[in-house]
Design a protein with these regions (language model features):
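Short, charged interaction patches at domain edges and termini
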Residues: 1-12, 25-26, 36-46, 86-111
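Small/polar-rich, solvent-exposed N-terminal microdomains that initiate assembly or binding
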Residues: 1-41, 59, 63-70, 75, ...
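Short, conserved loop-to-beta-strand elements that form functional interface hotspots
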Residues: 20, 80-91
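Residue-level detector of short, conserved catalytic/binding motifs and their immediate flanks
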Residues: 49
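Short hydrophobic/aromatic beta-strand micro-patches
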Residues: 52-54
Length: 111
């Protein structure tokens, strides 16, 4: 599963916790991974992955987002990843829960 690969990879690269879902008592700073789409043709899989960076300030959420982008630029060094490109990234503050958040969306080709 591509989510597991990204989870393990980012867990070793980032200074904040990486999660695949919200848990009780989340820390002030963390990253969530979510697969938002994908397809498979001729044994080659493509996935769209959204990575949300949370923090107590908008500036810190933006910094974590930059760390995520820098880390994923290097994920192609893994054998199972052949391409990773940034689709978009933007301020995605959760106004309902009053939590600062940035989101980066990546298109990943993997085996």
């Amino acid at each position: 599963m591509i989510e597991q690969t990204i989870f393990e990879y980012l867990g070793g690269k980032l200074s904040v916790p990486v999660r695949m879902e919200e848990e009780p008592d989340m820390p002030d700073e963390y990253v969530l991974i979510e697969k938002t789409g994908g397809e498979k043709t001729n044994y080659i899989s493509r996935a769209t992955i959204a990575i949300q960076s949370y923090a107590k300030s908008l500036y810190r959420a933006m910094q974590i987002n930059e760390d995520v982008k820098a880390a994923l630029e290097e994920i192609v060094t893994l054998d199972e990843i052949s391409r990773c490109s940034l689709n978009s990234d933007y301020n995605y503050t959760d106004t309902t829960r009053k939590k600062y958040r940035y989101q980066a969306v990546f298109d990943i080709v993997h085996y």
